[in-house]
């Protein structure tokens, strides 16, 4: 089940998370690359240090996603789509993520096992 999250309330949804998010990019072959990232808010952007692979992938394909795991079993994960820009200064790389869409998501209990629906997603507005 997914619940949309309004971008105007995203900072509150992020503040409720107890774990660091994973930043999801894709490499030249389309394979996913995931890495944990420490982020802070700067205006409307989420900003944090990133590695070489993330910088390379994000520069080539700036449409990325962030995934915050649920705080406890049965809770919602927070999934945020974002546009990534990488600032490079000396040997340091800084990811600047501008959120474009966000949802809370969790698997749903399937009331009828003969159906294909197996998720309980809700947009966060």
Identify the meaning behind each predicted range.
Residues 16-50:
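Short beta-strand segments
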Residues 8-12, 42-43, 92:
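Polar/charged alpha-helical tracts
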Residues 111-125:
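Short, cationic low-complexity segments
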Residues 1-20:
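Short, basic/aromatic recognition patches
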């Amino acid at each position: 089940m997914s619940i949309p999250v309004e971008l105007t309330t995203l900072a509150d949804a992020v503040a409720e998370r107890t774990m660091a998010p994973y930043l999801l990019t894709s490499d030249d072959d389309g394979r996913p690359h995931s890495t944990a990232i420490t982020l802070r808010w700067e205006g409307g952007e989420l900003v944090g240090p990133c590695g070489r692979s993330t910088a390379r992938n994000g520069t080539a394909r700036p449409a990325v996603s962030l995934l915050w795991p649920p705080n406890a079993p049965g809770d919602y994960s927070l999934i945020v789509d974002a546009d990534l820009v990488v600032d490079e200064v000396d040997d340091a790389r800084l990811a600047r993520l501008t959120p474009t869409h966000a949802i809370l998501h969790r698997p749903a209990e399937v009331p009828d096992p003969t159906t294909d629906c197996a998720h309980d997603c809700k947009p966060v507005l």
